[in-house]
Amino acid sequence: MAYKLILAAFAATALAAPVEERQSCSNGVWAQCGGQNWSGTPCCTSGNKCVKLNDFYSQCQPGSAEPSSTAAGPSSTTATKTTATGGSSTTAGGSVTSAPPAASDNPYAGVDLWANNYYRSEVMNLAVPKLSGAKATAAAKVADVPSFQWMDTYDHISLMEDTLADIRKANKAGGKYAGQFVVYDLPNRDCAAAASNGEYSLDKDGANKYKAYIAKIKGILQNYSDTKVILVIEPDSLANLVTNLNVDKCAKAESAYKELTVYAIKELNLPNVSMYLDAGHGGWLGWPANIGPAAKLYAQIYKDAGKPSRVRGLVTNVSNYNGWKLSTKPDYTESNPNYDEQRYINAFAPLLAQEGWSNVKFIVDQGRSGKQPTGQKAQGDWCNAKGTGFGLRPSTNTGDALADAFVWVKPGGESDGTSDTSAARYDYHCGLDDALKPAPEAGTWFQAYFEQLLDNANPSFL
């Protein structure tokens, strides 16, 4: 999958060249005006006020009140880097009741996560045989880490059915497992890039084909109503509508993306299901020029769908590399204040609440975020980035009330996109200096990348 991050010049402009005098303050509406490590001036242009959203982020919002020096000023507190203890591959234990959880409940609490056989077979049959000794032993441990299973084509829906059958069998034997899956087949998919273009096109009845795809998923979920399922909904799609409508393919897909996302979450609003809409990552939508419009869009989708009770919140950092809580700001994040995922979700949640989506919760992909900083030259370099490692294991022990769990959405070792410039799905990001090459097509096994993740894993598998 791909994140074509066109972080437009206005994003940088919103943070650039702060002036000293209040009367000439350049921090306009939705710009940052304070927070931890903020080096600019704590002021806003006329007609706006500086509002503290959290310790990390204060923002200029419409209003005439004068900014508070305590709300807007930079904090002297320094965040510490989170390190995990042990190598547990499941969430905290507990019992699963026969009744579905309330919408306010964390779906990750009280269950174990299922390590699906598809990823296990990739690791055991493709990765391990090419390794030896301690490294082969370490690689085999990766197969035990629960990751999401991607339904990136209609035909791959059957893999979910197979996995749910395995889970039901294990649960009848006394287990308490939940399955994790990604819904990822919108028509005109991956509109701002090429690496993960999908099977449906809007000009070839793609909308109706997508509805049939959703109907197939719904039927299976209803057949397994006794099994808890967690869904990630359409990586990249809505985020592209925030930043990439200047791309013709995205502009043409805008209304369909919105309508079909609403359709999907309404149809899949089942008692045994919990859903998280994909919301990019801090290096994409976390920029001050993007985070306000993003909150409006996501809240509107949620409201247009009738505020489905099984939509728990948002997932961030899918297939990306951002750390959760960093003590040092990586150079490649430039002036972005929300350069790690904890800062991002804590800046995002209050804005969503203002737009009508309150009590939103998050899950955060940390599957490839173990090495910080990475080898990226820009935070938007999404394709097979060098210098990355397996990260924090799936867990509900996040230390933040907004974060339900750390998860592995992207199966580590599957390629982000091909580096073959002659390929139909070649994207230039996969040919950048900071992308590992040669790389196969998106979704296919990339042994060299798996070994990089294993070598740099934090916590280590060795």
From Swiss-Prot:
Keywords: Carbohydrate metabolism, Cellulose degradation, Disulfide bond, Glycoprotein, Glycosidase, Hydrolase, Polysaccharide degradation, Signal. Glycans are attached at residues 37, 223, 272, 317. It catalyses: Endohydrolysis of (1->4)-beta-D-glucosidic linkages in cellulose, lichenin and cereal beta-D-glucans. GO terms for cellular component: extracellular region. It is an enzyme of class 3 (hydrolase). GO terms for molecular function: cellulase activity; cellulose binding. Pfam families: CBM_1, Glyco_hydro_6. The active site is at 190, 236 (proton donor), 416 (nucleophile). The keyword Metal-binding does not apply. Residues 66-99 are annotated as: Linker. Residues 64-102 are annotated as: Disordered. Disulfide bonds join 33-50, 44-60, 191-250, 383-430. This is Putative endoglucanase type B. It comes from Fusarium oxysporum.
